[in-house]
């Protein structure tokens, strides 16, 4: 609805194939208006200086190594973390990321190493355990991942898919403003967590 040339998104506007055209679908709106979309999804998650670097920096964690490597690219990080327990790290994530709710297990467990993976990273639990992490911090964690983590001696912090990736907007907007002073960059007002909690 605004005058722009490009929409830059983390999640692709067309994430799965379109089976029907719905008038309010963002892909339909963009196509009808002749607008362009550029999505930086898995490539930004895995890139050096990308999503997981930004997430670790916000949490005050320094990456030591990739949490999981595939095809020469890393996914998530293992970070050293001394003098904090799981509950304290969960609270830090809630405060720094602006989460309304953070779910976690094993709150009193002391942390020496933490696995960090933005978005939906429950699949990184085995890698976190294998790298000696006491906790995995990610989003979209299913109940069975919490149970598996407990059985492996690894706590899990679920700070939410939206909140562990929403950091993309401010980061990319800031980078674009710094590199292109004449470029108008706006963060969409529709960029919000639509999930309600009671």
Roles of regions detected by a PLM:
Residues 1-198:
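Active-site catalytic microenvironments in core metabolic enzymes, especially phosphate/sugar-handling
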């Amino acid at each position: 609805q605004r005058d722009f040339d490009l929409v830059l998104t983390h999640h692709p506007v067309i994430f799965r194939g379109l089976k029907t055209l719905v008038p309010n679908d963002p892909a339909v709106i963009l196509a009808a208006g002749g607008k362009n979309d550029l999505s930086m999804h898995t490539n930004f998650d895995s890139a050096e200086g990308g999503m997981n670097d930004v997430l670790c920096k916000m949490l005050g964690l320094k990456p030591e190594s990739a949490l999981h490597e595939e095809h020469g690219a890393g996914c998530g990080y293992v970070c050293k973390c001394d003098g904090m327990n799981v509950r304290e790290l969960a609270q830090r994530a809630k405060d720094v990321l602006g989460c309304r709710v953070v779910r976690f297990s094993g709150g009193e467990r002391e942390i020496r190493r933490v696995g960090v993976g933005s978005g939906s990273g429950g699949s990184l639990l085995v890698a976190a355990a294998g790298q000696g992490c006491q906790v995995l911090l990610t989003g979209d964690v299913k109940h069975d991942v919490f149970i598996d983590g407990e059985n492996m001696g690894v706590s899990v912090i679920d700070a939410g898919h939206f909140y562990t990736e929403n950091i993309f907007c401010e980061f990319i907007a800031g980078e674009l403003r710094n590199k292109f002073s004449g470029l108008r960059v706006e963060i969409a007002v529709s960029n919000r967590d639509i999930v309600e909690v009671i």
